[in-house]
Regions:
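P-loop NTPase motor domains
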Residues: 75-86, 298, 396, 409-467, ...
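Short, flexible loop motifs at catalytic/binding sites
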Residues: 472-489, 525-527, 676-682, 687, ...
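Extended, folded cores of ATP/NTP-driven motor/assembly subunits in large transport
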Residues: 1-444
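P-loop NTPase motor core of the ASCE superfamily
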Residues: 139-142, 147, 471, 553-608, ...
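H-loop/switch region of ABC-family ATPase nucleotide-binding domains
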Residues: 728
C-alpha cells in the first residue's frame, strides 16, 4: 500500500467532514470515432505546392479522362511508370464517377437564367430532369444515370525519407508533361478542390446548388474535410452512410436561399478488390470497365470510385527476387516431375519475360486495384450484381473485401497510400507484384467525351457523362451542320432543341420549315411565325436588302452581295438546271449595271430590262425566263418594291409548305430569305451567334443555281459568326440536289440520328461518309427509346461522340406539334396562368 500526503489528507477530511477535496468519480469524456482521424491531410505548403501530411508529403492533380487509347498511349504511360517515379513513392489513380453534375449543368443553366421567361423555365425543368437521372434511371430497361467522371492522380512519399521537395516537383512536371503528350489537360488540385472531392466521396447526397468548400489555412485540412452531419456505420461487408437531407436547392426570385429535402440520404457503400484479371489486356480495353458502349445492361447503376494504388519498392531487392523466381521455376520445369505440374512451364516463361523486361529498364511495383460503389440503401445487392457482371464480361473477377470496407474507402482518398495505408495493405496481403508496364495498361484513366466550352446543346453520354456541344466551338473551319435521321428517330425534336438551346444562350435563329413542325414552339418562345402564300403580299426584293453605303466602302461585302443576287436571278431564269457560262456572264453584267445605275432601289424588273436590252439572243431568252418574277408576272408581287419586313426578331420561322406545289417559286423565295439572313448577319455584332436552319434541305435546295448560292452563303456565315444547318432523313438525300450537296460539302459538323441498315451500307459502299469499322458500328447502334431519349452521333473536327438527348415534360410540351396541346396551353393562359405555368399544367406538372 502506498501512502502519500494527499491520501492522508483525504482520509482525514473524509473522517471529520464526510467529504473529500476531489470528486468521487473522474470527469466523463466524450469518446467518438472520427472518420477524419483516418485522413492523412494536415497543411498545404504554398511555396512548394505540396501537401504536408502526418507521415508523408505529395501533390494531387486533376486530369481530363482519356477517350479511348492506342498502343502509343500504353507506351507513354508505361515509360513514365517505369522511369519517372523514385523509389518509395506511392502513386494513386482515382477514377470517380461522381453524382455531382453541377459543374456541367450550372454553366449551361446560367445564360438561360439571365434570358428569363420561357428559357429560364426550360432550363429549370431540364436541370430537375438531369438531377433526377443521378439516382433514378432514365430508362425503364437498363441503367442510365447522369455522372461526372473525375480523374485524380496523386503522388506521395513517406516522411522521413530520401525524396526531396525538388525531386517531387520534378516528378510533378514530368507527370504533367506526360499527360499533355497524351492530349490530356492536368491542373493542380488545391486544398479547396481536395476538400470538395472528399465531400463528394463521403457525402454523396446531391443538391442542385453546389456546396462551397472554403479552405481555412489556419486549421488542419483533416478537420475541414469531413462534414459533421454524416454518420458512418462500419459493417463486415459494407458501410452504411447517413447524410443530411436538408440542403440548399436553389434561390427564389429575390435571391434568397431555399432549403429543401434531398434524397437519397442513406447509402450502402461497398468495396471490392480484383481477384483475377485476363491474361492479356490492352490500354484501350479499359473503356469496357466504365460501362459497355453497346450493351445497355452493362452500365453502372450507381456512383463508383475505381482506384489503382502503386507502391515502388527497393528495385534491387525486387530484381533479385525476380531472378531467384526465374531460376527456380526454370530448374523445376526441366525436371522429370514437371509433367505432373503443367503450370510450371507457364510460370517459367512468365518469369523469363519479367527478367527480360527488368533488363530493358522496366520496374516491378506493388499494386492494388479496387472499386468502391455508393448505392442508395436497399439497392446495394442489385447494384453489386450488375457491377460484377460488367467486370466479368471484360474478363475480370471482383471479390468482396470482407472486413476491409473502411480501408477501401480510405484508399480512394488521394495521398492516403503513402501515409501508412500501403503498410496496412502489405500486411493484409492485398498488394500484388506486377511490371510497371502492366500497371500502365490497367490504369483506370478512361472516361466519356466531355464536350466543348460553349454551353449550347446539352446531351448525356451513354455511360452518363453530361456534356455541351455547339457548332461554334470549331475555331479552325466553318460552323455549318448537316443533320440526318430517319423518320421516327427524333430528328424534329433535335432540331427544335438545337434552336431553343441557341436562343436560350442569346443567339439569333432563323428556321425555314416545310411541315409546320416549328409553328407552336416558335410562338410559345415569343418568336415570329411567317407563312408564305400567294396572297400574303410579302416583298423579298434582294436589291433593297443591301446596305448602299457599306457596299460602296467594303469591296468584299459588295462582291458577296452580288454573288448571291446573281444566284437568285440565275435560279429565277433556270430553276431546273445550272446556267451556262454565257448566261452567267450576261446575268453578271445585267446585275452590275442595274446596281450601278439604281443601287438598292433596283428590282428584278430592272435586271430583266437590262437583259432584254442586250445584243445577244441568250440575254433576251433570260429576260423572258425571269418574266414570271417581274411586275405583271405570276410572282412579281413577291419581288417588287422595298422588302416588306426585316429580321428584327431573335427567333423567326418561315413556313414554306404552301409553296410546295410551286417549286420554281419556293427555291427563289428560299434563296431570298437566305440572302436576307446573310444581310442581318452583317449588320449584327460578330459576337452574337446566328443560326439558319433548313429542314428537308434536299427538296428545299433544288435548283440549278442553289449550289453556287449555298457556297457563297456558307462563306458569308463563317465570316460573320453564323452557321448554316441543314436536315434530311438520310445522308443520301444530300446528293439529290446541287444545293443540298453544296450544304453537305461545306459543313464541318455532321449529326447522325438513327438510320436504316441499308442506308448505312450505302454510306460505306459509296464512300459518302468517312468511317472505319468502329464508326460504322456506332452508327448502327443508334436508337431512340420512346420518350426517354434519342441518340445522336456527332462527327466533326477531331470529334466523334454519341450523345443522348433527354427531354423533360416541360420541353416536350413546347416542342409538341399536336394542335390540341397548343390549344390547351392557350386556354390555360386565358384563365390567368402565366405561359410557364400553363405549359406546366398541360405537361402534367401542375402549377
Amino acid at each position: 500500500m502506498t501512502l502519500s500526503l494527499a491520501a492522508a489528507r483525504d482520509a482525514l477530511s473524509r473522517g471529520l467532514f464526510a467529504d473529500t477535496t476531489r470528486p468521487e468519480k473522474p470527469q466523463a469524456h466524450f469518446g467518438l470515432d472520427m472518420l477524419s482521424d483516418w485522413l492523412p491531410y494536415r497543411v498545404y505548403d504554398e511555396g512548394a505546392k505540396l501537401y504536408r501530411n502526418a507521415r508523408s508529403k505529395g501533390f494531387v492533380l486533376e486530369v481530363t479522362p482519356l477517350i479511348g487509347a492506342d498502343e502509343r498511349t500504353g507506351e507513354i504511360l508505361g515509360q513514365f511508370f517505369s522511369e519517372g517515379l523514385p523509389q518509395g513513392s506511392c502513386l494513386q489513380v482515382l477514377n470517380f464517377a461522381s453524382p455531382r453534375i453541377g459543374s456541367v449543368v450550372g454553366p449551361w443553366f446560367a445564360p438561360r437564367y439571365e434570358q428569363g421567361g420561357i428559357y429560364e423555365a426550360i432550363a429549370r425543368a431540364r436541370t430537375r430532369r438531369l438531377y433526377d437521372l443521378v439516382w433514378n434511371s432514365g430508362s425503364a430497361h437498363a441503367p442510365f444515370h447522369a455522372r461526372n467522371v473525375r480523374l485524380i492522380v496523386s503522388l506521395g512519399v513517406p516522411v522521413p525519407g530520401s525524396v526531396t521537395d525538388a525531386e517531387l516537383s520534378e516528378c510533378r512536371e514530368g507527370l504533367v508533361g506526360m499527360l499533355h503528350s497524351l492530349g490530356l489537360h492536368a491542373q493542380e488540385l488545391r486544398p479547396g478542390g481536395l476538400l470538395a472531392l472528399i465531400d463528394e466521396l463521403t457525402s454523396p447526397t446531391t443538391a442542385h446548388e453546389t456546396d462551397i468548400h472554403a479552405w481555412n489555412p489556419h486549421d488542419t485540412l483533416q478537420s475541414q474535410a469531413i462534414r459533421r452531419d454524416i454518420e458512418l456505420e462500419v459493417g463486415d461487408d459494407r458501410l452504411i452512410l447517413r447524410t443530411e437531407r436538408f440542403r440548399e436547392t436553389g434561390r427564389d426570385e429575390e435571391g434568397n436561399p431555399e432549403v429543401g429535402e434531398c434524397y437519397p440520404d442513406h447509402f450502402d457503400v461497398r468495396h471490392y478488390a480484383v481477384r483475377s484479371t485476363p491474361e492479356r489486356w490492352a490500354p484501350w480495353e479499359c473503356a469496357r470497365l466504365i460501362g459497355d458502349m453497346f450493351t445497355d445492361k452493362l452500365r453502372f447503376p450507381c456512383p463508383t470510385a475505381t482506384m489503382l494504388c502503386l507502391v515502388y519498392p527497393d528495385q534491387e531487392a525486387a530484381s533479385a527476387r525476380a531472378g531467384f523466381k526465374f531460376m527456380r521455376t526454370t530448374s523445376l520445369s526441366q525436371t522429370k516431375s514437371a509433367r505432373f505440374l503443367p503450370k510450371l512451364a507457364e510460370q517459367s516463361a512468365e518469369w523469363r519475360h519479367v527478367q527480360a523486361e527488368l533488363q530493358a529498364g522496366k520496374k516491378l511495383v506493388k499494386l492494388f486495384y479496387g472499386l468502391t460503389s455508393i448505392s442508395p440503401l436497399g439497392q446495394g445487392d442489385a447494384h453489386e450484381r450488375i457491377i460484377k457482371a460488367i467486370y466479368k464480361a471484360a474478363g475480370w473477377d471482383l471479390a468482396d473485401e470482407r472486413f476491409l470496407q473502411l480501408q477501401g474507402l480510405v484508399a480512394a482518398f488521394p495521398l492516403s497510400l503513402a501515409d501508412g495505408l500501403a503498410d496496412d495493405m502489405a500486411r493484409l496481403k492485398r498488394l500484388k507484384t506486377m511490371l510497371s508496364t502492366t500497371a500502365a495498361h490497367i490504369a483506370p484513366m478512361q472516361g466519356e467525351y466531355l464536350g466543348g466550352v460553349i454551353p449550347h446543346l446539352l446531351l448525356v453520354g451513354r455511360r452518363g457523362q453530361p456534356f455541351w456541344w455547339s457548332p461554334f466551338e470549331n475555331t479552325a473551319g466553318n460552323h455549318n451542320i448537316a443533320i440526318c435521321g430517319k423518320s421516327g428517330s427524333g430528328k424534329s425534336v433535335l432540331l427544335q432543341e438545337l434552336c431553343a438551346a441557341l436562343r436560350g444562350a442569346g443567339a439569333k435563329v432563323v428556321v425555314i420549315d416545310d411541315g409546320r413542325s416549328f409553328e407552336h414552339s416558335v410562338k410559345l418562345q415569343g418568336g415570329r411565325f411567317v407563312e408564305f402564300t400567294l396572297a400574303s403580299g410579302f416583298s423579298l426584293n434582294p436589291f433593297s436588302m443591301v446596305d448602299d453605303a457599306r457596299a460602296h466602302e467594303d469591296e468584299d461585302y459588295r462582291l458577296d452581295c452580288f454573288a448571291m443576287i446573281k444566284a437568285i436571278v440565275g435560279q429565277m431564269a433556270r430553276p431546273g438546271t445550272a446556267p451556262s457560262d454565257t448566261e452567267r456572264g450576261l446575268i453578271d453584267r445585267a446585275v452590275t449595271a442595274t446596281w450601278e445605275a439604281l443601287g438598292s432601289g433596283a428590282s428584278v424588273d430592272d435586271v430583266a430590262h437590262a437583259l432584254h436590252g442586250s445584243e445577244s439572243e441568250a440575254g433576251r431568252d433570260l429576260a423572258t425566263a425571269i418574266a414570271p418574277f417581274c411586275r405583271g408576272g405570276s410572282y412579281g408581287g413577291f419581288f417588287a418594291g422595298k422588302a416588306s419586313f426585316a429580321l428584327d426578331d431573335d427567333f423567326t420561322v418561315f413556313e414554306m409548305s404552301d409553296l410546295a406545289s410551286r417549286e420554281e417559286l419556293r427555291s427563289v423565295v428560299l434563296s431570298a430569305i437566305m440572302f436576307m439572313t446573310s444581310q442581318a448577319m452583317t449588320r449584327s455584332s460578330r459576337a452574337t451567334k446566328k443560326l439558319l436552319l433548313i429542314d428537308e434541305a434536299w427538296a428545299m435546295l433544288k435548283g440549278g443555281s442553289m449550289g453556287e448560292f449555298v457556297e457563297t452563303y456558307a462563306r458569308t456565315a463563317r465570316k460573320y459568326g453564323g452557321a448554316l444547318a441543314t436536315a434530311t432523313q438520310s445522308l443520301n438525300d444530300y446528293y439529290k440536289s446541287d444545293g443540298a450537296r453544296a450544304a453537305l460539302e461545306n459543313s464541318d459538323w455532321m449529326l447522325v440520328l438513327q438510320q436504316k441498315a441499308e442506308t448505312i451500307a450505302d454510306f460505306r459502299a459509296n464512300a459518302r461518309l468517312d468511317m472505319d469499322d468502329r464508326t460504322e458500328t456506332l452508327i448502327r447502334s443508334l436508337k431512340r427509346s420512346g420518350t426517354e431519349y434519342s441518340e445522336v452521333f456527332i462527327k466533326g473536327p477531331e470529334t466523334e461522340a454519341v450523345g443522348r438527348l433527354v427531354l423533360d415534360p416541360f420541353s416536350a410540351t413546347i416542342y409538341s406539334s399536336d394542335p390540341d396541346t397548343y390549344a390547351a396551353i392557350q386556354d390555360c393562359e386565358r384563365r390567368g396562368h402565366s405561359l410557364a405555368g400553363a405549359i406546366r399544367i398541360v405537361a402534367g406538372g401542375g402549377q
